[in-house]
Amino acid sequence: MHSPLEIARNYIEVGIHKVNLSIFKTILLGFFAGMFIGFAGIASTTASSTIGIASVAKLVGAAVFPAGMAMVLVAGSELFTGNNLIILAVLEKKVTVWKMLKNWLFVYIGNFLGAAFVAVLVVVGRTPDLFGEQLAQAIVNAATARTNLSVGEAFVRGILCNILVCIAVWMSFAAKRVSGKLLTSYWPVMLFVLCGFEHSIADMYFGVCGLLTAQAYGITAESLTWFNFLVKALLPITLGNIVGGAGIVGCGYWLAYLHRTPYSADTTAAEQEEIDIAEEY
């Protein structure tokens, strides 16, 4: 297992690699991550849609959703929320703020396209027909729950969510084997879903799928509009994710492990030999 200091140093190299990807590769890998999270979203809703006890339904959905993060970490993709940790490389002056923001933008675009792609295919494929169209109602309810949040609530839930998501990514870097990555990343992701915190990329899927399902199945949901989804929900959730991931986890761990202990490729060569950075992609 890698120590927290090794994880921090490793992520500097990972951050350098990420920001130097071409725009095409960044968007393409972002598309894959968006799809993976979208698959987790529909699976989570399907698993919990017919369970009458709300807390049990929430637990079942939370138990299923981490499959999306597992695919992101192991299959190779770029997830906006996890990439908030690039701030470590910025604070170490190995990456410019501009390059980090550019990466975030194109990954975010790719994530949206991937999540929306899954949402469209779910509706076109009539997946919401399951369980006598109970799944259709559950999909719309999931989207409406997000658009019913106040801007402040959405922002705070976004902060809480990405603290856990970035901790999941951080913990996965401690593992040297795939099994370890899956096990360590599972619990923080399960917790954020169970607690009802908001993940911007997951909400891209939930929002688009909810809007399309409501239209296709004639389900009325007054608060479920494109404006409410994009501006009232997704925007503050995204900003909250940045605060939680880059501000709290990224800056916090930089202060704990790297501040006044600058990264040096020469002094940590032996440590870096043990870390297979390529497996993160």
Task: Identify the function of each model-found stretch.
Residues 1-281:
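Alpha-helical transmembrane segments and their helix-helix packing motifs
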